[in-house]
Amino acid sequence: LQEYQRLISEEIELSRLAEDDVNLPAQLKSGERIKVMLNAGLSPEHEEKLGSRIDGIGLYRTEIPFMLQSGFPSEEEQVAQYQGMLQMFNDKPVTLRTLDVGADKQLPYMPISEENPCLGWRGIRITLDQPEIFLIQVRAMLRANAATGNLNILLPMVTSLDEVDEARRLIERAGREVEEMIGYEIPKPRIGIMLEVPSMVFMLPHLAKRVDFISVGTNDLTQYILAVDRNNTRVANIYDSLH
């Protein structure tokens, strides 16, 4: 929790420093325009304030509400949470990442103790092993998206094509369940993965046939390529994404 509070303070300070430039177009010298999207989930009030100045939400960290509660949020609680974000940016894409816990992100009501947590049970590995957690969350996302149609679903810590296939199967199942519940066809979200595991770089041609987009998770990808724990002060000096 302290780490996220620190991140909130950093984001607010960086935004204050960039206030003078925020209304300028994000444009290359060639004239090509670049879309600027927000990493969200830390400060809803701040995100709403920036709404008109950005092109959407590139990453919404759904694990934060999970971490702030004493137990798993219900499907209804999650619907309300995601609906607020999707409606706030209803004419822009919003990318919701499925529950990404483990390693340095722990749930107080689901402690995970491992000798090497960075290489252990985390991200999509947890939610595919506990499919009810995944199904409840995805149903909530799809229900929240029923009226807006601007949802992208992002899968974290993917290590194999089998994980992508299984996640897509569960998302399709959740979609059928939601349609049966509400009685009409719902918009189909775009589905993507976080590219964080080095081996998946070599699987890109196969991934491209299975997903709609790929988001590069530079923090973990750098950590795994360099074999450096970025949170370990003894070796943090050699954690360099430019290497």
What are the functions of these language-model segments?
Residues 1-6:
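Conserved glycine-bearing catalytic or ligand-binding loops at nucleotide- and phosphate-handling centers
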Residues 7, 11:
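Residues that form generic nucleotide/phosphate-binding pockets
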